[in-house]
Structures are given as C-alpha cells and as structure tokens.
Amino acid sequence: MSGNTLGTLFTVTTFGESHGPAIGCVIDGCPPGMGLTEADIQVELDRRKPGTSRHVTQRQEADEVEILSGVFEGVTTGTPIALLIRNTDQRSKDYGNIVETFRPGHADYTYWQKYGIRDYRGGGRSSARLTAPIVGAGAVAKKWLRERFGVEVRGYMSCLGDIDVPFVDWSHVRENPFFSPNAAIVPELEAYMDALRKDGDSIGARIDVVASGVPVGWGEPVFDRLDADIAKAMMSINAVKGVEIGAGFDSVAQRGSVHGDELTPAGFIGNHAGGVLGGISTGQDITVSIAIKPTSSIRTPRRSITKAGDEATVETFGRHDPCVGIRATPIAESMLALVLIDHALRHRAQCGDVETSTPKISGSAT
C-alpha cells in the first residue's frame, strides 16, 4: 500500500489499523520555532472522538495523543513530528461473522481483490478510525496558519439527510454534537437520528468548510492547483462521495454574468469561485462543501457474497456511526488546513519575493 502520504513540502504519513494497538502519523516539513504541546492537538481530537453522544458510535476511545518527536521544550524543531494515539476499546469479536463475507458498501471486497488479504476487524486500514491522526496533524497546521497568517479554518453541518440546516452563527457550532450552526434545529436533528437508529439504518450529510484570511497567490498550476489539491484531500476522507468549491454544481445553471465575480477597487463582488481562480487563491474566503454517504455498516440484513463467491446475507453488529457526517466537521477542517499549509510553504519557496504594483483588493466589496 503506497498511498499513505499527503502533501509536498508539509507531508503527513498516517499508519495503523482500527483494531491494532495504535494509530498515528508522521508530519514532515513543519517549520521550526512554533510553540506546540499535546494540549494544542488534544482540543481538536476531542471534537472528533467517538462516544460523545448517543448519535455516534459508542466505541469509547479517549484518543489521547502523544508527541514522540519533533518538539523540544514545547517548540517545534523542524524535524519530523510523530503523533501516536493508542487504541483501547476494540471489540474484534463483533466482526466474527464477516471473516469470510464482504460487507456491502465497504472496502472489504476491493481490499481483498487488490491485496489478497484484509483485516476484517473494523475495516482495518480502511476504517474512519484513521481520521484521528489527520485531525491531529490538522491541529498543527491550523496553529501555524493562524499564527503566521491569521488564517481561520472552520466548518459546520449544513444538511443531515433531507434536513437543511440554515446557517445562523458560528458560536452555535461547538455547542451541539452535530456541529450545527443553528441551535433551534438541533431537537429536530436529534429526533431524526433517534428514529433512524430504531430503524437500524443510516443516513448521509453535507459539511461546509470555510478558510478565512488566506492571502492571494497560494496554489501551483497546472496540476497542483489549490482547488484540485483540496478536492483530492476531501475525497480522501472516508465516505465522501462529492466535493464542491464555491458555487460548485450550482454553476451549471448560472449565467456567466452572474457566476463571474467582478472586481472593484473595494474588492470582489461575490465569491462564486469559492476563493480560487486558475487554481490560485484570490484572497477571499475559500469555501468547500463535501457530501458524505450513509454509513454502510447497518443492522438491516443486506445481500452479499462470500470469498468463495457464494450468496450470503450480512448484518453488521459492530459499534458504528449511524451518520459518519456528524463527526466529520473537524476532519474536513483538518484536510483543508493541511492543503493550505502545504501550499503556503510552496508559495514561499518559489514566489515569496514576488511583488506587483497592483493593490491587493479585499475579499469582498460588501
């Protein structure tokens, strides 16, 4: 398996499996001189960790992070930063019924056909458990971006199943388990999930992420465009089946006179481009949305086949999120932050001395 590393100058390599002794990552390319403690990382991991409400998996993992290297006396040294998170609440016996059978909608069948071996315990390497190290690395990226450029990366749930969640205020996002920016709609979301759990079924969600304060100029055309790398990173998150930048698929029905964001001395009029033009950041907010499919592990019996190709019925008994989108907000934030820090360093390496006579206009004229 060779696709375990994200990034070019700021790289993150993850390791581990869902039911192994530990999971973690190695971060290479983090600039030296930044203050960093385990507490800086833990606060982000706590936002993602399981067992925090009745609406998510009841697997009880503390997700306590250990910094093994790359930090001396609370300051990054510029050497690789190794993060370790120990698994403490595995129940491998829950997966005994799928040793010879593939779960529909999971990576079981494809991993088996590609590698000729698979870890059936919780999906092994393909488990969303492996997003914890991504959030850990994302905490490092967020801190550097915030301190160096004033960049803030924030996300929220904008849709759960067929329930739209109108944005009200960022202050509500951290006050409920859904990362909803609308406190009034939380009871409806809770009732929806309670009914879904009784049905033994699952549902999908939409997560919106916004990066504010990104300077103009980040991105490496043609094949490492900023939006292309964002899309790749987001599609690397478990269960993500769609990514939109800016207006996204709504652009199809927009006329050019509407979609094209006009420029004025006071700033851009509109942000249908989502903060990226020609693969390069414009200085506006970078806006990203992801579509997350329903959890494939459900208690409803499903048709499948065995390794021998015989027909079988699969019913999943492990502890699973009825909607993986509920805990996906900090993961999506982290992925965006990892792409941004990588491109910040790449821009500094090649174009850090470039200056033009054109004023940098503000992100919005309104």
Swiss-Prot record:
GO MF terms held by the record: chorismate synthase activity; FMN binding
Disulfide bond annotation, renumbered to this chain: none
Pathway where this protein functions: Metabolic intermediate biosynthesis; chorismate biosynthesis; chorismate from D-erythrose 4-phosphate and phosphoenolpyruvate: step 7/7
Similarity comment text for this entry: Belongs to the chorismate synthase family.
Assembly behavior: Homotetramer.
Name of the protein: Chorismate synthase
The enzyme's E.C. designation: 4.2.3.5
Residues that hold FMN according to the record: 125-127, 238-239, 278, 293-297, 319
